[in-house]
Amino acid sequence: MEALRQRIETAFENRQHITPGTVEPSLRADVETVIAMLDKGEARVAEKINGQWQVHQWLKKAVLLSFRIFDNGVIDGGDTKYFDKVPQKFADYDEARFKAEAIRVVPPATVRKGSFIGKNTVLMPSYVNLGAYVDEGTMVDTWATVGSCAQIGKNVHLSGGVGIGGVLEPLQAGPTIIEDNCFIGARSEIVEGVVVEEGSVISMGVYIGQSTRIFDRETGEVHYGRVPAGSVVVSGNLPSACGKYSLYAAIIVKKVDAKTRAKVGINELLRIVD
């Protein structure tokens, strides 16, 4: 693995000279190996080690190299055709393989090769980009988007129209991460490498990037780039220092533990008690 990493790092430094016509066969094979590892979940762009998220930048670089190495080709989409560099993940699946992996895919859900989909997941008509990791028991609802290299935990619900940002366009340092047992409400956007920690509930229409103030109304703390574990978050605003206007903010209205979350419905958690 270390030798593979070093070869990818070296190639990435010289990427401006790489094209589908000039790429060395050995580099093509290396990138294909990485894409296959990501596709099977044998490697992931970020993983939690000793309680901290570690980003494996070289895997992200391999994904970026793939766009320089592979040429566009025709992809059969049944009633239509597509022309792209990245094949579809399920292009060679049959009934037995879908059953073995316990994945339900509702048309016209699109999942690019190089993304991992865990067991007992449900993909409604949605989009999962390459390098993404979607863990087991997760629901990706209609028109939700899981961006490149995003990390989605176990038993997560991404509601209709949710956008989870990617790292490739524009290039970001770290992927957006939704930890286990989170609920992301309809049409919310979590982007720019924000981490939503375990057991959090995000209401409908909440937008969080690295510059978004995440205000805890109980403690007065302001967080950036991280939603603390067990937070219940709604959209709101905070007054300016001069008091003449207010600016958008995400508001933590309460904290819940796993026991409370198991007993109480999502809608009940989102009711604000003044």
Curated annotation (Swiss-Prot):
Catalytic reaction list: (S)-2,3,4,5-tetrahydrodipicolinate + succinyl-CoA + H2O = (S)-2-succinylamino-6-oxoheptanedioate + CoA
InterPro entries assigned to the protein according to its UniProt record, in alphabetical order: DapD_Trfase_Hexpep_rpt_fam (IPR005664), Hexapep (IPR001451), Hexapep_transf_CS (IPR018357), THP_succinylTrfase_dom1 (IPR023180), THP_succinylTrfase_N_sf (IPR037133), Trimer_LpxA-like_sf (IPR011004)
Sorted UniProt keywords: Acyltransferase, Amino-acid biosynthesis, Cytoplasm, Diaminopimelate biosynthesis, Lysine biosynthesis, Repeat, Transferase
Localization annotation: Cytoplasm
Binding site for substrate: 104, 141
Pathway of action: Amino-acid biosynthesis; L-lysine biosynthesis via DAP pathway; LL-2,6-diaminopimelate from (S)-tetrahydrodipicolinate (succinylase route): step 1/3
Documented EC number(s): 2.3.1.117
Biological process per Gene Ontology, one example term: lysine biosynthetic process via diaminopimelate
PROSITE patterns linked to this entry: HEXAPEP_TRANSFERASES
Top-level taxon of origin: Bacteria
Cited NCBIfam families: dapD, PRK11830.1
Name the UniProt record assigns to this protein: 2,3,4,5-tetrahydropyridine-2,6-dicarboxylate N-succinyltransferase
